[in-house]
UniProtKB/Swiss-Prot annotation:
KW Glycosyltransferase (keyword) present: yes
Source species: Paraburkholderia xenovorans (strain LB400)
This protein's name: Adenine phosphoribosyltransferase
Pfam families: Pribosyltran (PF00156)
Keywords, ordered alphabetically: Cytoplasm, Glycosyltransferase, Purine salvage, Transferase
MF (Gene Ontology): adenine binding; adenine phosphoribosyltransferase activity; AMP binding
Disulfide bonds: none
Domain of life, source organism: Bacteria
Amino acid sequence: MSNALPSAPLDAADYIKSHIRTVPDWPEPGVQFRDITPLLQEPKSLRVLIDLFVQRYIDAKLDYIAGLDARGFIIGPILAYELNLGFIPIRKAGKLPYNRLAQSYELEYGCATVEIHEDACKPGDRVVIIDDLIATGGTMMAGKILLERLGAVVVEGAAIIDLPELGGSKLLRDSGLALYTVTGFEGH
């Protein structure tokens, strides 16, 4: 990515989208992988991204940002730091050392499980769940269920990218979860 200013003004969402690389046929044929590493590598684009989330949540009276394993662990702690909040990791099964709750969810072929520490938050705590991308919505839905089992109020789900054709954002909204995504891509 160049440090040169764009020739035409871009809004923040277009600027962010311009820093996401599409890798065709990865990890398997037919998949268009949306790679956020160029976005993370450039300090300016990372700052613009975090500032978008900070502006959205600065007055939301939150207690925590919860990040989904693994790319939610990249932006979640930065956002929590900027908002002076705690960070809750929601991990893949078998990664958390203390007493935990688990929630399974369906994948295209099979299922997966995420876990949260049983003392991650208290009833009534206000939480935003964050990840890099919403595809089928399964991971974010499982995270929402876990937080609600602990009594948290899940204020919103947030992601950099929405892939609306995969149905995840609709599934999450239909469940009552408000969503904020910075940008979206058509296709897989």
